[in-house]
């Protein structure tokens, strides 16, 4: 029954993407016959001789052929956390035909991302990222090797270094000032009614990242094409592919229109990048003075011959694709979750606002340098990232060779997920792990930059998020200004604050708040 439900859901999703509906009528019986044959064959199959000799980690019971796919549910990070409580912090599963390791503790996460990072630092090559990110020539999804090392070096030293983060300060300052102005206007027009704060945060975050990458504002894009297409790309990166889990059924992805749909999204971005690169090359030839953005920097690197390989235009596009996806989504997602938590915790809200306003003083505005003195704000941000890591299941890694982990045998080519959601809510490490308690960090120096494995919202090791400094700088500055310039409350007020805000999630590459965030702002006068 679980098998039929799974395929029915996937097939219906595929139907929405495919324009060949008449062909699909004939495809359904063929699909059913294929499933029946494969199901019958695998029921009688036994584990390989090699696997019988290995000491594999504990595994939940799995179904023939689909393995443990049916146990993932709508929120895999939550389902896998629940399973790990029964089967342990190192758990072996099968997602279709793919052997998969789930890591759910800080100790084992450290082993994967530090002690044996060189073994686990590659990426499995899957359908959607390969198509959408130029056949694995980006940074996030590229397999480990010389190409990845070179492009990551470009990213760390040229694009997202601390020096570059400071260079783009002007974009953050100008866009946050505009955000404050928009909130004031919306508040005045609403006359005490709630405003859609989430919508404003999305716009501001995307404006900052677009100005840094393109030299243009997000709002300059006609018909909101950029925002909608980026959102769809984010959704499809995590979409289901038959070929990824059942290699013999890869043809179904083509037949149901899935591959064509992914390529249509890729083509839209590819045309956009072509136009963007041509515009930047033309501007460089004119020689007019202007602020350099990330496209300019990449074109300079492409032309200076400093790399051990040719940085092609496709390589440049792949890196830009990473920047958009990683930069635009995580900042506003974190800000929305944090304001949601604060609105339900007025004591914490008051305490952090008092600190922000005390540090900024009578100057009448917040400077980025002030944030270093806002210790409690840092605690609040850490606690928010602990409860709501942008990607609760870190991007999958892949074992490049046979390896031991926690006393168990892990075969080469095993896919590895570190469940940051489970690690950061581990009751063995955190007191009252499901509660929002920023004070836990006042006497705890645990950081989120990948050195402390109890808190890994951005990963760690060679695969730590290279844009961490950029994203954190943007989020901190946005939040400090919102807390300085406005008092905030929930629309309905009342004593049962936790019941007035829907904290439901939407799962994807990053986990968003399902319902829009509406809050009531009251302007503050220094």
Curated annotation (Swiss-Prot):
Catalytic activity, reaction form: (E)-phenylacetaldehyde oxime + reduced [NADPH--hemoprotein reductase] + O2 = (R)-mandelonitrile + oxidized [NADPH--hemoprotein reductase] + 2 H2O + H(+); phenylacetonitrile + reduced [NADPH--hemoprotein reductase] + O2 = (R)-mandelonitrile + oxidized [NADPH--hemoprotein reductase] + H2O + H(+)
InterPro entries (UniProt xref): Cyt_P450 (IPR001128), Cyt_P450_CS (IPR017972), Cyt_P450_E_grp-I (IPR002401), Cyt_P450_sf (IPR036396)
Cysteines joined through disulfide linkages: none
Keyword Heme among record annotations: yes
A molecular function GO annotation: monooxygenase activity
E.C. no: 1.14.14.44, 1.14.14.77
Keyword Metal-binding applies: yes
Listed PANTHER family: CYTOCHROME P450 71A2-LIKE (PTHR47955:SF15), CYTOCHROME P450 FAMILY 71 PROTEIN (PTHR47955)
Family membership: Belongs to the cytochrome P450 family.
Protein name (record): Phenylacetaldehyde oxime monooxygenase CYP71AN24
Gene: CYP71AN24
